[in-house]
Amino acid sequence: MSATDRMGPRAVPGLRLALLLLLVLGTPKSGVQGQEGLDFPEYDGVDRVINVNAKNYKNVFKKYEVLALLYHEPPEDDKASQRQFEMEELILELAAQVLEDKGVGFGLVDSEKDAAVAKKLGLTEVDSMYVFKGDEVIEYDGEFSADTIVEFLLDVLEDPVELIEGERELQAFENIEDEIKLIGYFKSKDSEHYKAFEDAAEEFHPYIPFFATFDSKVAKKLTLKLNEIDFYEAFMEEPVTIPDKPNSEEEIVNFVEEHRRSTLRKLKPESMYETWEDDMDGIHIVAFAEEADPDGFEFLETLKAVAQDNTENPDLSIIWIDPDDFPLLVPYWEKTFDIDLSAPQIGVVNVTDADSVWMEMDDEEDLPSAEELEDWLEDVLEGEINTEDDDDDDDD
């Protein structure tokens, strides 16, 4: 699925332009001189992105530890299509330049000219980027900008399991709250149960962080028993222990797949399309709140409390979007949803046509309480608040 299709339908006119603008997020400002230590990279004009075809693909794979391939349709003849493809190439060229010393390569696979190669490599979604590392293939579902792609690939280069060996690392682990995380306690790296945990981690790397400890003191603070694995849902303080330890790779993978949709989850640039595509029967409950803003912070804390109280409800999933993370999309969202993102908002969005209904807040200075939010969410889940009713009102 193409980048312009993922956050909504092709029929939404402003979306294509908004996401095209996002392509330039990673490009440097020309004419701005960086001081030593803050010298942003500028494209040096060297071609590093390879056109991968039947003749060279085997050699290309041998050359790089990690290879990112953009599977694309041939650009159309019109100027806009040609320009967009050139921009995408430049973004990949800059990322390739930055990561050249890390053993990361970039390539293009044409869906028409190189269809046979695409089939051999398992490339199925046109306008998607696939990342190859060893035996693993990762589909990149994030913002197409150089900085986000580079950050993602640096994470790919890291080991799939991070070890917790002391108090500071434990504190850093505990400070992670806005994403799913797992941690297990094992005897050593040679343990067969740790190997199973590591193999499972590779299945979700780098989207879901896996941690492990071999330190009994760390395990005691986490109340972990030997070969036990705890699963933390995003924004939840208490973990769920994967049952029936010791667990096989298959058991761990199945558990994560079953529980990976958190009650409250944050839309992030590196995984924005994956999150948006994971809708609930064609709708999303979406909350906008700036964490750095006092009202946004207060509203977010209320959302967390509601999510924690309703974590057992499989039908409830709220996507939190911090507008500060997506400045170029703010005007589009405000126009499409007819809302003011200078204040917190929560609503229901239809992913097919971007129709939406937003919670009415009686007093702009008085944010909704947890009880009021729960009542509103209950009405949404029961179908009393939905985007179809909003369409009927518009017709009237």
From Swiss-Prot:
One of its GO terms (molecular function) is calcium ion binding. Its main location: endoplasmic reticulum. InterPro entries: Calsequestrin, Calsequestrin_C, Calsequestrin_CS, Calsequestrin_middle_dom, Calsequestrin_N, Thioredoxin-like_sf. The modification Phosphoserine is found at residues 81, 216. N-glycosylated. Residues 1-34 form the signal peptide. Expressed in myoblasts (at protein level). It is a peripheral membrane protein. It is found in: Endoplasmic reticulum; Sarcoplasmic reticulum; Sarcoplasmic reticulum lumen; Sarcoplasmic reticulum membrane. The keyword Transmembrane does not apply. Changing residue 103 to D: In TAM1; increased calcium-dependent susceptibility to proteolytic degradation; decreased calcium-dependent aggregation; decreased calcium-dependent polymerization; no effect on subcellular localization; no effect on the subcellular localization of STIM1; decreased calcium content of intracellular stores; no effect of the ability to inhibit store-operated calcium entry (SOCE) activity; muscle fibers with the mutation have significantly decreased calcium-dependent sensitivity to caffeine. Pfam families: Calsequestrin. The modification Phosphotyrosine is found at residue 43. The keyword Signal applies. It is linked to Myopathy, vacuolar, with CASQ1 aggregates: An autosomal dominant mild muscle disorder characterized by adult onset of muscle cramping and weakness as well as increased levels of serum creatine kinase. The disorder is not progressive, and some patients may be asymptomatic. Myopathy, tubular aggregate, 1: A rare congenital myopathy characterized by regular arrays of membrane tubules on muscle biopsies without additional histopathological hallmarks. Tubular aggregates in muscle are structures of variable appearance consisting of an outer tubule containing either one or more microtubule-like structures or amorphous material. They may occur in a variety of circumstances, including inherited myopathies, alcohol- and drug-induced myopathies, exercise-induced cramps or muscle weakness. Calsequestrin is a high-capacity, moderate affinity, calcium-binding protein and thus acts as an internal calcium store in muscle. Calcium ions are bound by clusters of acidic residues at the protein surface, often at the interface between subunits. Can bind around 80 Ca(2+) ions. Regulates the release of lumenal Ca(2+) via the calcium release channel RYR1; this plays an important role in triggering muscle contraction. Negatively regulates store-operated Ca(2+) entry (SOCE) activity. Monomer; increases in response to a depletion of intracellular calcium. Homodimer. Homotetramer and homopolymer. Can form linear homooligomers. Ca(2+) ions promote oligomerization. Interacts (via C-terminal end and preferentially with the monomeric form) with STIM1; this interaction increases in response to a depletion of intracellular calcium, decreases both STIM1 aggregation and clustering, interaction of STIM1 with ORAI1 and store-operated Ca(2+) entry (SOCE) activity. Interacts with ASPH and TRDN. Belongs to the calsequestrin family. This is Calsequestrin-1.
